[in-house]
Amino acid sequence: MKKNKLFMALMAGTIVISGCAAKTDKKEESKTAQVNTSKGTKEQLKQATDLYKKFVENQVDTLLKDTEKFAETIKAGNLEEAKKQYPVIRMAYERSEPIAESFGELDVNIDFRLADYLEENKTEEGWRGFHRIEKIMWEQNTTKGTEEYADQLVKDIKELKAKVATVEVTPDLMVTGAVDLLNEVATQKITGEEEI
C-alpha cells in the first residue's frame, strides 16, 4: 500500500511537473510567436508607409509639373484649356492630401475653400490657392487676375514637394490623414460643399 501511495505520489508529481513544463513551453512559443508577429507587422507597416510616401512623392511631382503648365496656360489667357487642366491637377493634390494636410499653413495656402477662409479671417484678403483661381475662372469667366495666384501656387507646391521629401511617414500619419480625408469626403465633397 505504501508502495502504491509512493508510486501514485511520484506519478502525480511527474504529471504536474510535465504539465507545468508544457505550459512554460506554450508560453515561450506564444512569446516567440508574438515577437515574430510583431516583427512581421512592423516590417509590413514600414513597407506600406515607404510605398505610400513614394506614391505621394510621385503625385506631388506630377502636381508640380501640371501646375507649372497650368500657370503657363493661365498667363497665355487660354481660359478653356485652363478649365480642362484644373480638375486633373486637383486629382494629384487630392491623392497626396493625407500627407499634405499635415503641413497646416501650406495646405491652407494651396487648398483652402473661401467659406473656411472667411470663417477664420473675416476677409478674402490673403486667400489664395486652387480655390481662389477656380472662383475667378468660373465666376468671372476669365484668367485675368489669376496670374499672381498661379505663380504663388507653383511656389507653394515647390515648398510642398520639399517638405514631403523630408517628412517621416508613420502609420499614424498615414491612417490619420486617410481618415481625415474620408471625413472630408463624407461631409463636404459628396454634398458639394467643397465647391462653396
What are these regions (language model features)?
Residues 33-196:
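Mature extracytoplasmic or organellar-lumen-exposed domains after removal of signal/transit peptides
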Residues 2-13:
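Non-globular terminal segments
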Residues 6-7, 17-32:
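Bacterial lipoprotein signal-peptidase II cleavage site
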